[in-house]
Amino acid sequence: MTTSVSPKSRSLFTAFFWLFNLSLLLVIFIGFLPFLAMDILNDALRGEVPFSILIPVFGLIGVPTTSTALGIQRKRQLNKISNLKPAAPLGPMPQPISLFQIFFGLEAPLLMACTIRLFFLRALTPASSFLFISLAVGTIALAHWLLHRHHRQSSWASWMHLAGLTIMLVLSLYLSVIALFYVLPLIVVMGSALYLSIFLVVLIPIFFPFIMVFSGLVMMPWGMLRLFLRSWRQTLQSLSQQHGKTLPRAWVGTVLAVWLGLLLLLQQQPQTQAFTLLEKQPQSEGERQALLQNADAIRKGLLNAYLSAYRYPLLEDKGMYRMYSNLLGAPNAVAETVQDAYRTVLTPFAYQGNALDKDKAAQLYAEFFDTPILRGEHSTIQNAVLSNFNRTEAKAGLLDIGAERVRLQQQDVSITPEGDWAEIKLHEVYANTTFENTEILYYFSLPESATITGLWLGETADLAQRYEYVVAPRGAAQQVYTDQVRRQVDPALLEQVGPRNYRLRAFPIPPAGRDLLPQDGQPDRMHLWMTYKVMKQNDQWMLPVLNEQRNIFWTQDTQRTLNGKPQQKSDAWLPASIPADVSEPASALQAKLPGGYVVAKPLAEQDYQLPQGQHFAFIVDRSYSMEAHRKELEDSFQWLKDNLLGANSADLYLTRADGTQAQKVSSLDAFDPGKTVLYGSLQTRQMLDQYQQVAEAQNYDAVILLTDSGSYELTQDGSPLPLAAPLWLVHLGGLQAAYDDATLATIQQTGGNVAADIKTVMTRIATQPSLGQGTSLLNVVDGYAWFLSSTPDSDVKTVEAVAPMAARQWIAQVSQAVKPDQLNQLDAIHQVAKENSIVTPYSSMLVLVNPEQKRQLKEAEASDRFNREVEDQQLPDPQDEIAPVSAVPEPAEWLLLLACFAVLAVWWRWKATRNEINHNLPPLNEV
């Protein structure tokens, strides 16, 4: 490339090149690397940073460093060339790549790409990814051309050079057009700086590197345009001399057509199609089937709309309008025109919709896919949240589900066997990995006969200093816990949220590095203890089964012990069970309660029966989420046909997502679960309402709903349903994590329950053992039959220690007759729970640490004490999270504060000077 550059211009650019790169390296290695970059790299080691974020981080460090190294190498090459004295004149010697070419051809495009990707874009779209790939291809083409331009090149290489330079020329022109919008504001800012320069002398050393970096970034698009235009023209002329003008020009046109076609194709955003497809409710099975065939397109479109704030950062942005209106004083019409033009130019980065589409997408997703979008698209949303250079903001937006904020440092399980039953104690130690107070949450399940008997919190392992629980009404306990979390005070709450489901929450886990405890010299930790009693089941002691955890995680470094003995590392929270001593056969037990005795009798395999001569109603959940469990549904119906229908009768009710009444099928043989259409969203209450609309006059021995694990967050508060038959929920694929209180009350009041398979339900319904007159059956569960007797059984050993389990079975039975508006009945049940220190559907355990919390609990117990709200109807929304504010500024914040004070000082001095000038001006009547 031949250029006619004056020595003065070359010297000025050389000075600019070195000043810019030295300033940029100063900013990067003093400001960017110690603060932002190190946070990103540390998170990357934990797997919390997408690879697309790591590339620009390394690029911002490596590009100016490499460019500076190339500049130094070029200087050395020039010195060597100047020292060469050829014996004969051989013509001009090939010159090394110029600083202009290094800066605008290599450094500028890569630096701009890294800056835009890291600071302005989060989750990449197909269009933005295509532009970055195009920029990389064009830069590689120029680099190859610069390295080989003095050598004979193959025809194929020349054509590729022309293609790459053509693409890069278009991109340079595109960036130059964007930069034009900043020309007038830049002139105004520079003019103001010149006007105030006399007052900025002291601040010049501080702001000079930033001024140089900013000036260089603004100059880059035009310098790139000039360089790539000259390189493109030279390559085009070279090929035209070899092949004529027509072929190279046709090649340029083809490259442009293909490139623009691909860009336009990738700019098509999928949310428009998704919204159109879901605009009207389908009225027939054929229409539903057609929508299901487009499920992938609908998923992509709704996800794109939901993540619009992450994928399209310029969504409804008014920055250019404010810049021209406020800074330049332009009329509103002019500022609006500039804003519209700016948005048009940035179409590849703009969202084709409005900010309300996010909520619309979340609602439509839940209605179509039968699960909250934050669950269904967890990994994609998590990746978008983590694609942020600001790690504090990224971590604040992390979904609590699966988030790794609090490490389980230690876990101790202690089992104290007492023959057929045992007391199990779980002790855990939590270490926060963040610098904010953090809540942990477990959803877990226990055997239905297991009974939780204690909960404690502590700041150390000293049992004498731990905070003890109180048994409180479920609504009052929830209210106090929620209020105390808002006040950043330590509480813990353990609730029963299903027949065998529990929710455990503890707050706050102390921030990492905090050490407020005297004389221990260790970072603060939180200790938690939980105890429960459980009957032996299949010669095993059953441990809690984790359904979901939030914020808590464990690693191979987590210390685990069982009865004081170290255990092997595990990826699971707890083992499913621990082998029990089988030397003694199971025997009956009894415990005394006020008003009678509760007897637990072990059952043998032959004691279990199947129904005979009964009439059942089977309700089938036909929502979209059941598609993942279609095989289990087919197996369940096959079992019913093989084992139940010959001796019993049944009606089938098929639910519908359109909200109409269920479809009744009189014969189960006529239903093929492999062909039924599974569509839309259905909750338990909706399906039962549809059933009741059709089956008002039917008398059934039991109502069985075949569903999946459900979505607790999509349920609504309500009242129990007045069903005439016991309600049993069969959760194919696993139990639901939690139930709303209305559904739980419906199950309890009808004498139903939940299970994970149809066989368990049928055997529990049919197995009705008896101990004779004066006794009544309470429950058949976990290998035991529980009875209530008015007198003690002389042949059965009385064990007062099993009274908590006996009280739990008694409460489960009397719950069938309890009305939710009868506080005296609920208070009586709660009193039994308090006397036996147990968790029940009506009574929760709350750990309180100060008198104020106890006073608040007493106030809460005086009013709406048993009404509990549905938790997390919407999961934590990362777009609503706000980065926490630290009480002590970080180093980067000190720099920002210094800059703010400097600006205020300059403004004050400028205002004083202007007032002085105005004061010295003569009055108007004297002019």
Locate predicted features:
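Pro/Ser/Thr/Gly-rich intrinsically disordered low-complexity regions
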Residues: T2-R405, T451, L463-A464, A702-L705, ...
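Short, solvent-exposed beta-strand/turn "edge" segments of beta-rich domains on protein surfaces
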Residues: Q410-K425, V429-T434, L446, L517-G521
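Von Willebrand factor
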Residues: Q609-L706, G710-E713, Q736
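Solvent-exposed beta-hairpin/edge-strand motifs
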Residues: I373-L399, L441-V485, W554-W573
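Surface-exposed beta-strand/loop patches in extracellular or lumenal glycoproteins
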Residues: A431, E436-S449, M542-Q556
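A surface-exposed beta-strand-loop module
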Residues: G454-W456, A461-L543
